[in-house]
Amino acid sequence: MSETELINNDHMALWYDPVSKFVHHKIKKTLPKGAFEEMLSTGADYLEKYGMKKWLSDDSNVVAITKEDSEYGDKIWAPRVIKAGFTYWAVVMPTSAMGNLQVTRFVKEYRERGVTVEVFDSVDAAKTWLNSK
């Protein structure tokens, strides 16, 4: 495995893969205040630093994203990473109904912003797709 760990705690994990050139996050359980922003901001730093265009979101354990976190992603993070060249997003969808509904909305919004987004049931399938890009 060529992924380098950036964050790993009870709530989330974040890696980057310098070989396949993607950032990968996993939300393990409901995030405390500030954690979502920390995870996305750290990932954006690596995306910019290494000229990466791909992101893998393992959101299978997402129950819900807070309004505050959703607004951060929409207003701060998205413009930043799209400007940096973010082009491909692989999403492992949440198993919870509420989480699935929210992430489905995010997928639609990012497609409208010009990002190529595909949804998956497993991390392995998501990685295979990203590696083909």
Question: Where are the regions a protein language model picked out?
Answer:
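Amphipathic, Lys/Arg-enriched alpha-helical "gate/interface" segment within cytosolic domains
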Residues: 2-133
